[in-house]
């Protein structure tokens, strides 16, 4: 799940935001990590990454029970927010099924978030044209990025707190 500020980029982008999948996978980025409201970092484990392996080819590892752990963390963090009960049903399926590629999981989550934000229209075509995945080319530890991306917390913070007004809140 990309940080909420990533979705702000959609709101301020003049025409469209390009999402790239043909880049080399970089570890320790938003491609497989998210920080949720209580400061917990959720990380989707991936199978061994080869040197310069493309982002779209990264496979998810299911050796641990990460899906169950992530869902429990999401529930305990957001269960008292105003819109959790309404939006939880859209996200629970991601924690019940196994998706082979991280690329596909990110795309499905992204499409769901875009659909829920309503004012942002998804123009996504996974694996067609190869222009779809999280583009995180900046150094996520850098001060410069923190000035734009703030605390890097997940879009779920705002979605569960503000519901249908999330888009207005992001602006």
Residue spans of the language-model regions?
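Residues lining hydrophobic/aromatic ligand-binding pockets adjacent to catalytic sites
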Residues: 1-123, 131-171
């Amino acid at each position: 799940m990309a940080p909420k500020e990533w979705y702000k980029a959609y709101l301020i982008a003049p025409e469209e935001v390009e999402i790239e999948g043909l880049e080399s996978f970089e570890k320790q980025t938003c491609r497989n990590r998210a920080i949720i409201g209580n400061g917990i970092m959720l990380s989707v484990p991936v199978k061994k990454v080869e040197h310069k392996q493309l982002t779209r080819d990264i496979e998810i590892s299911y050796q641990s029970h990460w899906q169950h752990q992530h869902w429990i963390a999401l529930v305990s963090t957001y269960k008292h927010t105003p819109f959790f009960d309404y939006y939880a049903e859209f996200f629970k399926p991601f924690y019940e099924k196994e998706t082979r590629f991280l690329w596909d999981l990110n795309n499905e989550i992204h499409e769901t978030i875009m659909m829920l934000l309503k004012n942002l229209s998804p123009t996504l075509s996974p694996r067609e044209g190869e222009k779809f995945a999280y583009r995180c080319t900046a150094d996520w530890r850098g001060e410069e990025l923190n000035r734009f991306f703030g605390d890097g917390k997940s879009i779920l913070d705002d979605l569960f707190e503000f519901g249908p007004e999330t888009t207005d809140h992001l602006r």
